[in-house]
Design a protein with these regions (language model features):
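Short, strongly hydrophobic alpha-helical membrane anchors
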Residues: 1-14, 156-160
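N-terminal signal-anchor/start-transfer transmembrane helix
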Residues: 13-40
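A generic, lipid-embedded transmembrane alpha helix
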Residues: 48-71
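Alpha-helical transmembrane-segment detector that highlights a single hydrophobic TM helix
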Residues: 65-108
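Juxtamembrane boundary at the C-terminal end of a transmembrane helix
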Residues: 138-160
Length: 160
């Protein structure tokens, strides 16, 4: 199925959205599991944070997979500014924003930013850094995953 060029700039087929959808669900659930392991969520808290984690992961991955396109349409690639004109510089900035967002959200689960047992959960920086690194490095490992994923998840069609 082909999308019109004006619907989502830079995306011409639904297959180009596969890495965002598949990795968004997997990494969003991974983020949720890390928090769920440390804190017993119930009912709407679990659903609310899960929905928030997955949606935010979709947004971050959309920007990560379309960084070159963004830099080209904004003209930032030609500016040659040290970090902002670099594809990896922008991806790392997105990863830092994602890392801080995850840590802040986990810190306020119980209503505090102190990061202690009484003030909030404050998910470990290690956990949030692992998730952020998986998001930032997604364009590198996605081609490896395509070979083992089913076709409906963006994998290579089976021959035969």
């Amino acid at each position: 199925m082909v999308l019109e060029e004006g619907v989502i700039p830079g995306v011409t087929t639904l297959a180009e959205l596969a890495p965002i959808i598949v990795l968004g669900i997997v990494l969003g659930l991974y983020e949720l599991i890390l928090i769920h392991r440390d804190e017993s969520f119930r009912g709407s808290h679990w659903f609310g944070h899960g929905f928030h984690a997955i949606v935010f992961m979709f947004v971050a991955l959309f920007f990560i997979f379309n960084t070159e396109y963004f830099l080209s349409i904004t003209g930032l690639a030609e500016k040659e500014w040290p970090v902002i004109s670099s594809t990896w510089g922008v991806r790392i900035i997105i990863g830092l924003i994602l890392n801080i967002k995850m840590h802040a959200v986990s810190a306020v689960i119980k209503g505090g930013l102190r990061g202690s047992m009484t003030g909030g959960m404050a998910e470990h920086w290690t956990h949030t850094t692992v998730v952020s690194a998986l998001v930032v490095l997604a364009p590198l490992y996605w081609p490896l995953l395509v070979g083992i994923l089913p076709e409906w998840a963006g994998g290579v069609p089976a021959e035969g």
